[in-house]
């Protein structure tokens, strides 16, 4: 998935999922609280792969159990209605600091939902070409492949 779309949640916390994202996510998919106060949307297949990666770690390690608890306790399964809307639980919206205006962003095999204000803050840093070069260099030094 790729691209970004500005969206507004209605009074019932319903969000219209862009049709291109609906095609990839399917009618029923998973929403998880992300690490940077965003919500992550994954298809059933993608969530199963994600879940298996987490479960394949050493669950004897207390930190891994904490992370597993955090992820799975903050995940819901949702189904879209005929208009492509999903209801997002209030507790997840509060944790992600999303009130009404939001941006949904395609990020490869998942989509992320951000508050519009937070998304603008984090993306404004990269309007400067030097910041993008610095980020790219740091990632290459860590072994990233683009």
Curated annotation (Swiss-Prot):
A GO molecular-function descriptor: transcription cis-regulatory region binding
Localization of this protein: Cytoplasm, Nucleoid
BP term (GO), one: negative regulation of DNA-templated transcription initiation
Residue ranges of domain SpoVT-AbrB in the record: 4-46, 75-118
InterPro entries noted in UniProt: MraZ (IPR003444), MraZ_C (IPR035644), MraZ_dom (IPR020603), MraZ_N (IPR035642), MraZ_sf (IPR038619), SpoVT-AbrB_dom (IPR007159), SpoVT-AbrB_sf (IPR037914)
A GO CC annotation given for this chain: nucleoid
Keywords: Cytoplasm, DNA-binding, Repeat, Transcription, Transcription regulation
PANTHER family listed in its UniProt record: TRANSCRIPTIONAL REGULATOR MRAZ
Similarity-based family: Belongs to the MraZ family.
Self-association state and partner proteins as the record states: Forms oligomers.
Entry protein name: Transcriptional regulator MraZ
């Amino acid at each position: 998935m790729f691209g970004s779309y500005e969206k507004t949640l209605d009074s019932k916390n319903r969000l219209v999922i862009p049709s291109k994202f609906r095609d990839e996510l399917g009618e029923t998919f998973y929403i998880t609280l992300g690490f940077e106060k965003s919500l992550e949307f994954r298809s059933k297949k993608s969530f199963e792969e994600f879940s298996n990666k987490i479960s394949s770690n050493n669950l004897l390690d207390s930190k891994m159990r904490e992370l597993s608890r955090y992820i799975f306790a903050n995940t819901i399964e949702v189904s879209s209605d005929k208009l492509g809307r999903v209801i997002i639980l209030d507790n997840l919206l509060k944790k992600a600091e999303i009130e009404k205006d939001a941006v949904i962003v395609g990020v490869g095999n998942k989509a992320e939902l951000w508050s519009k204000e937070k998304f603008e803050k984090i993306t404004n840093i990269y309007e400067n070409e030097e910041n993008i070069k610095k980020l790219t260099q740091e990632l290459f030094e860590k072994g990233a492949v683009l």
